[in-house]
């Protein structure tokens, strides 16, 4: 046989290496010097050798095991906190397995099975599932904020508590494991975990380190309808942590985030100390309607029978600053008759854009030989001499005329009429007011739309018809037309809206702000809640108004190069002006319809113009962020929400995040350091200092008042008690009733019992029983006043004839704590009548608490077909306008948000792991979608108190055709201040009837 020399086993070699490594770690942890370690190692070797030489028995194997055991006992004793078991390392940061080093990889780069990987992450979810053989599978969902993944670990049951002590939700950890496709859910996971280490929070946390800090005056929360993605609490918390003195909450058209912002100051769970000087500035971004601007600009009393020139122009674009006129068409009208015409092409001296050629059918060859505007404009003005100018959407046409007059040094002030405004006034049934739509409505033909000469002729005929309609309304001059033209509610609903920031300065301003919200939802709602300028002026006391963003009327006026008098009129309306970072408005650069903005330089020019206007008119200019999400990375949530709602540009998110003072100073560095500091720091703090620290929720209780309710309740209860128990009441009945009534009356709750009593009795009179629900059955006063049929006294027998009662017999006592109706039937020992079995043994404290001061919650089940009558009867009790349905707020639910996220990535061909979709879903839930009403909740307002003292009001889901009015706030926000009746609908009373 060919024998080979025995070779050392690789397994033994690996085991030896592992032992050496562990010994080295032990020595390192014990802080032994290399010399000491070497000496101890030599001593151990010598001792082992001596023992080996002196022992020649066959028990060599046993001796080796004893030596090994002693060595590891010694090693274990040298460690301070190394516990062994699932921890294989003495490093205190190691919570499982062995220590490991190396670079981690981002989760987004893990797209398939890659073998062993190291990752850093935050634990999102922890789930422990016990399986067979006394083992548990620990399922972790983790994220590094580039992606998410599931980690699976198999542990012995006794190991689970110690591992989950460190591996818990929110923990930042480093894992070493193997990527694999899970055979149960076919998802890529990480398993075979060989090490877990604790690490510090690796997120990049922005802090505001500026010694002087700004104040953000323009913030949207999740209550901005499917737009903002940050909670009010998170915004307030961040501003407070950054050391800002205040932050403004300004949602689109609503104030429903106010209660949440106010809870930030709560004694329990609040993120801001109650005695802090930090302020929340309460406001909204209103949809402002300029009902003060007349149909006629610069009116001077001209007669409607006077001279008018109706004209139209075609241009190379939309901005009078960067675009040129290519055609002018005009018609002269005198005393309602067309008397002359003017028509000409104009050479723009630049190529006509393709889209304009497609729209107007005017090409370069048609204008090549035409005169330029320097030649044409004086001739056109001569044609217009002595006449009032008329155009459809006149601000656009006149902006080009006035800009070219300015360039040529010609007069720039003209009286002009807008036929769009006339159409809104005279044709209220129309929803759109384009020229062809208006022409069709008044029976005028339009042959070649978007040609100046034809549009002018059509507009002239429309104008002549409108003048005839004005005569029928006794309107004979332009001043009267202006006075009557924009006052109707219907007209206001069809005027364009502009954004404006409205802030409440004090308690008066808060109430006035709530009145604006109520009116904008109840009276002026059309697609959005509208605030007419006239209404704002009426309620201006205690309010500040700012010019808002690029959707504000000042910014829009600058884009269209409105005349200086118009700009001055707009600036004077506002208390302060706003400018915003260039990124907020960069979307306009790529917008083909926006010829005014072609670069960042154009955006800078507009911001500088606003700053200049602020200096000119002594208005503070503030730099705001128009915050829609907290941090730059949070834009993904808004992107998904907008994509889910059909916005084609959802992926082009503007950087609408909350910036630090340094970031804002850098944004506006082009203004110079001094001016940048003024708009970023000085003026924002100045506005904040003008505003008092107020509470959006009135702190006091305001129960309704019904005269003599205290005495009435006493009388009703005792009359019923005597009717049931006889002239001499049992002591237990009298004592319980007195105790309850004293508690109810002393805390001001008698009126609530009387209201419920009136509703129940009215329903009974009309033939419908009413069932009580909840803990009201524990109140004997409720039983005696007819609110409930539940008797909360201990079980007892009661004779309906002679009033005999039995509370104390041994037979009755056996049913203590149980229901009296379960006692055996019994005959009255006095008169022979069958006894009633009463009592459910419910303590009164169940209803009103141990001190009797808990707010009573009386829930009543009315017949479903009678419920509306019961609601209306509350108005009979308290008077019209004193009761409101309890409002609710519908937000984006988790399942719906999951669909939004899943569809977003599928439509873009991107695969996302299920756990990453769930992480993003959390950022999308809770965003306001709609409003509704509690099925039976009625809020009752005391007589003589306005509802806006507590909350604005609106129609549920903003249904303009509904006659139901609900609270604007979710009713939970105010149910501690106003009485809420629960008048619920139920099938049982209907079926019993």
Task: Give the positions of each predicted feature.
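A short interface-forming secondary-structure element
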Residues: 1-21
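Short, conserved charged micro-motifs
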Residues: 8-14, 511-512, 947-949
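Low-complexity, glycine/alanine/valine/leucine- and proline-rich hydrophobic stretches
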Residues: 14-15, 952-976
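A short amphipathic beta-strand at an alpha->beta junction
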Residues: 20-50
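Non-catalytic interaction/regulatory segments
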Residues: 21, 44-81
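Short, intrinsically disordered, charge-balanced linker/junction segments flanking boundaries
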Residues: 22, 991-992
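Phosphodiester-processing cores and adjacent nucleic acid-binding clamps
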Residues: 48, 52-61, 89-315, 319-324, ...
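Prokaryote-biased recognition of long, low-complexity C-terminal linker/tail segments
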Residues: 69-94, 108
């Amino acid at each position: 046989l060919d024998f080979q020399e025995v070779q050392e086993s690789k397994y033994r070699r690996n085991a030896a290496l592992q032992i050496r490594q562990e010994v080295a770690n032990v020595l390192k942890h014990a802080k032994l010097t290399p010399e000491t370690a070497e000496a101890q190692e030599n001593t151990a070797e010598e001792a082992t050798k001596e023992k080996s030489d002196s022992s020649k028995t066959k028990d060599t194997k046993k001796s080796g095991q004893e030596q090994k055991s002693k060595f590891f006992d010694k090693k274990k004793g040298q460690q301070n906190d190394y516990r062994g078991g699932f921890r294989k390392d003495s490093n205190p940061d190691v919570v499982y397995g062995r220590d490991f080093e190396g670079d981690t990889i981002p989760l987004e780069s893990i797209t398939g099975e890659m073998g062993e990987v190291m990752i850093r992450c935050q634990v999102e979810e922890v789930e422990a599932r016990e399986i067979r053989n006394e083992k548990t599978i620990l399922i972790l969902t983790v994220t590094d904020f580039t992606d998410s993944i599931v980690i699976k670990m198999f542990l012995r049951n006794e190991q689970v508590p110690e591992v989950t002590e460190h591996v818990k939700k929110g923990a930042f950890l480093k894992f070493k494991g193997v990527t694999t496709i899970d055979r149960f859910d076919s998802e890529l996971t990480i398993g075979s975990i060989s090490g877990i280490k604790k690490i510090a929070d690796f997120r990049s946390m922005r802090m505001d380190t500026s010694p002087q800090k700004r104040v953000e005056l323009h913030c949207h929360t999740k209550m901005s309808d499917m737009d903002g993605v940050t909670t009010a609490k998170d915004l307030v918390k961040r501003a407070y942590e950054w050391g800002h003195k205040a932050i403004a909450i300004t949602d689109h058209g609503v104030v429903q985030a106010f209660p949440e912002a106010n809870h930030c100051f709560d004694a329990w769970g609040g993120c801001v100390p109650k005695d802090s000087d930090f302020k929340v500035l309460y406001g909204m971004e209103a949809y402002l309607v300029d009902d003060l601007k007349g149909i006629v600009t610069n009116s001077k009393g001209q007669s409607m029978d006077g001279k008018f020139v109706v004209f139209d122009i075609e241009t190379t674009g939309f901005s009078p600053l960067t675009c040129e006129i290519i055609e002018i068409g005009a018609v002269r009208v005198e005393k309602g008759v067309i008397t002359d015409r003017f028509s000409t092409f104009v050479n723009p001296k630049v190529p006509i854009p393709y889209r304009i050629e497609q729209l107007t059918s005017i090409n370069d060859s048609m204008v090549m030989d035409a005169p330029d505007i320097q030649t044409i404009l004086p001739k056109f003005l001569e044609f217009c001499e002595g006449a009032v100018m008329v155009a459809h959407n006149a601000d656009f046409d006149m902006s080009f005329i006035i800009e070219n007059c300015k360039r040529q040094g010609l007069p720039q002030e003209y009286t002009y009429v807008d036929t769009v405004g006339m159409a809104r006034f005279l044709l209220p049934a129309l929803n759109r007011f384009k020229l062809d739509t208006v022409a069709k409505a008044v029976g005028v033909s339009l042959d070649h739309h978007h040609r100046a000469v034809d549009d002018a002729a059509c507009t002239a005929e429309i104008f002549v018809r409108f003048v005839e309609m004005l005569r029928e309304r006794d309107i004979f001059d332009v001043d009267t037309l202006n006075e009557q033209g924009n006052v109707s509610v219907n007209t206001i609903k069809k005027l364009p809206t502009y954004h404006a920031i409205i802030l409440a300065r004090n308690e008066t301003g808060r109430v006035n702000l709530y009145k604006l919200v109520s009116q904008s939802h109840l009276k002026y709602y059309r697609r959005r809640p509208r605030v007419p300028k006239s209404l704002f002026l009426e309620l201006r006391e205690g309010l500040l108004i700012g010019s808002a963003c690029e959707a504000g009327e000042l910014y829009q006026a600058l884009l269209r190069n409105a005349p200086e008098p118009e700009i001055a009129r707009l600036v004077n309306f506002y208390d302060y002006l706003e400018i915003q970072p260039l990124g907020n408005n960069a979307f306009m650069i790529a917008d083909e319809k926006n010829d005014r903005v072609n670069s960042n330089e154009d955006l800078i020019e507009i911001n500088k113009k606003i700053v200049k206007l602020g200096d000119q008119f002594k208005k503070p200019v503030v730099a705001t962020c128009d915050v829609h999400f907290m941090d730059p990375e949070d834009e993904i949530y808004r992107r998904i929400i907008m994509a889910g709602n059909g916005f084609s540009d959802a992926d082009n998110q503007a950087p609408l995040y909350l910036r630090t003072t340094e970031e804002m100073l850098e944004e506006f560095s082009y203004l110079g350091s001094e001016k940048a500091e003024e708009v970023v720091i000085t003026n924002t703090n100045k506005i904040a200092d003008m505003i008092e620290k107020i509470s959006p929720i009135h702190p006091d209780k305001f129960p309704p008042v019904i005269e003599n309710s205290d005495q009435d309740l006493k009388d009703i209860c005792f009359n019923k008690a005597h009717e049931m128990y006889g002239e001499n009441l049992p002591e237990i009945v009298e004592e319980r009733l007195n105790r309850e009534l004293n508690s109810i009356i002393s805390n001001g709750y008698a009126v609530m019992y009387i209201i419920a009593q009136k509703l129940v009795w009215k329903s009974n009179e009309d033939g419908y029983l009413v069932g009580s629900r909840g803990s009201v059955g524990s109140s004997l006063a409720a039983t005696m006043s007819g609110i409930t049929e539940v008797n909360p006294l201990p079980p007892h027998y009661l004779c309906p004839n002679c009033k005999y009662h039995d509370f104390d017999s041994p037979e009755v006592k056996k049913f203590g704590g149980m229901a009296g109706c379960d006692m055996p039937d019994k005959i009255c020992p006095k008169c022979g009548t069958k006894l009633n079995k009463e009592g459910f043994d419910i303590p009164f404290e169940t209803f009103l608490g141990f001190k009797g001061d808990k707010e009573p919650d009386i829930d009543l089940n009315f017949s479903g077909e009678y419920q509306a009558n019961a609601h209306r009867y509350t108005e009979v009790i308290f008077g019209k306008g004193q009761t409101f349905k309890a409002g609710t707020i519908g937000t984006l639910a988790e399942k719906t948000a999951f669909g939004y996220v899943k569809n977003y990535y599928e439509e873009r061909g991107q695969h996302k792991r299920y756990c990453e979709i769930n992480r993003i879903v959390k950022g999308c839930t809770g965003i306001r979608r709609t409003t509704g009403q509690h099925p039976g909740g009625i809020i009752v307002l005391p007589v003589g108190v306005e509802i806006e003292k507590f909350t604005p009001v609106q129609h549920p889901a903003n249904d303009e055709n509904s006659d139901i009015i609900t609270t604007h706030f979710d009713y939970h926000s105010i149910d501690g201040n106003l009485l809420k009746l629960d008048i619920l609908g139920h099938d049982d009373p209907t079926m019993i009837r």
